[in-house]
């Protein structure tokens, strides 16, 4: 009986080992190919443009999904027997994704390098040559994602890399980081949301009304964030209204009712937010009744002192 017990224990251990051998841990079970369409911008669009070139459909690599890129997407979808709607969803990404490894070169490698730089600050030369530095960066990302660090960029690595959130860049001087709820490292969002906000902030900076304070967005891999009922899926970002003295990054916080509230400048800010993400702004919560009447913002409780942008 004792011997039978030892045999059963050994069998259970071997079964667990065999089952685990082919199933690497999945750190991001929510990982999925992003839905990318007209008006989107950012590092995912850059990768898309490189991958189109890898399939013989070169377009200008500008990080914006405009008419030229959309036309190339439609042509690619038609050639692959996919729904030719110009929307890059899971089936189109899956068909575009090219497995690359050390020794390969070309636009698909450039797509990998650009994504690693944008989402993991890899510091790679986006030269299209899959050398040792790129291989090490790929392995580091794979370890980070829990998908098996073999250095080969296959379907699972593409999906996790394209899904992974991006940190807002505060180094340009057009924005300043704020953490009103004490959430450290909470300025991550989808690549599209980040790029669209950065473009809006850059355009707004040209008005001379000072940099844009950015409150919480989300954590690197999403999930619950203290002080927020949303901000879990990388599509929600808080920014602060503009002051008449343009000191919104250094002076005290205001509401739309404060004497130092600059309605005209805040209106312009919302207009830039919408203009830089055509068709991709779900809503902007902010309780200024004038901006609400103009169709620029939507009323919601506790949104007197910040604008809550929800991208789609």
Model-found features: residue ranges?
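Catalytic cores and adjacent binding grooves of peptidoglycan-active enzymes
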Residues: 159-160, 187, 228, 233-235, ...
């Amino acid at each position: 009986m004792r011997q039978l017990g030892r045999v059963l224990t050994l069998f259970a251990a071997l079964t667990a080992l065999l089952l685990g051998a082919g199933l690497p841990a999945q750190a991001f079970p929510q990982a999925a190919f992003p839905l990318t369409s007209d008006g989107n911008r950012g590092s995912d669009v850059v990768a898309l443009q490189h991958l189109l070139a890898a399939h013989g459909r070169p377009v200008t690599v500008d990080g914006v999904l405009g008419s030229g890129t959309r036309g190339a997407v439609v042509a690619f979808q038609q050639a692959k027997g996919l729904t030719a709607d110009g929307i890059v969803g899971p089936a189109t990404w899956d068909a575009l994704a090219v497995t690359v490894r050390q020794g390969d070169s070309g636009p698909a490698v450039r797509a990998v390098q650009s994504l690693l730089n944008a989402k993991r600050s890899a510091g790679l030369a986006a030269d299209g040559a899959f050398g040792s530095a790129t291989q090490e960066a790929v392995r580091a990302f794979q370890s980070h994602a829990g998908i098996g660090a073999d250095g080969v960029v296959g379907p699972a690595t593409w999906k996790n890399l394209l899904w992974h959130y991006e940190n807002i860049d505060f180094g340009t001087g057009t924005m300043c980081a704020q953490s009103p709820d004490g959430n450290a490292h909470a300025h991550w969002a989808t690549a599209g949301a980040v790029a669209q906000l950065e473009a809006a902030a850059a355009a707004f900076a040209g008005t001379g009304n000072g940099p844009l304070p950015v409150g919480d967005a989300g954590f690197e891999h999403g999930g619950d964030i203290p002080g927020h009922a949303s901000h879990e899926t990388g599509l929600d970002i808080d920014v602060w209204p503009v002051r008449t003295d343009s000191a919104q990054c250094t002076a005290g916080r205001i509401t739309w009712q404060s004497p130092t509230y600059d309605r005209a400048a805040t209106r312009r800010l919302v207009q830039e937010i919408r203009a830089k993400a055509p068709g991709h702004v779900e809503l902007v919560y902010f309780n200024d009744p004038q901006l609400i009447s103009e169709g620029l913002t939507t009323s919601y409780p506790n949104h007197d002192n910040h604008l809550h942008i929800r991208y789609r």
